[in-house]
């Protein structure tokens, strides 16, 4: 499964380095799109918790086509 996480603000290189399983690119509204493969929905929840611990505000989560 592939998921995309839209983060409200730009993500620093330091924060992105803490999430090596995700790629990132600027989002048109000024935030950041982070995306990558996950094993299952528990993995999605773990990523969300890690993002929260890094101070990232996730505003949208969506499953991408495989």
Language model regions located:
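Long, contiguous binding/interaction regions
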Residues: 1-66
């Amino acid at each position: 499964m592939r998921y995309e996480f839209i983060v409200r603000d730009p993500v620093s290189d330091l924060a992105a380095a803490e999430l090596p399983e995700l790629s990132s690119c600027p989002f048109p509204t000024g935030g950041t799109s982070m995306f990558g493969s996950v094993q299952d929905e528990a993995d999605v929840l773990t990523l969300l918790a890690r993002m929260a611990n890094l101070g990232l505000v996730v505003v949208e989560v969506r499953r991408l086509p495989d």
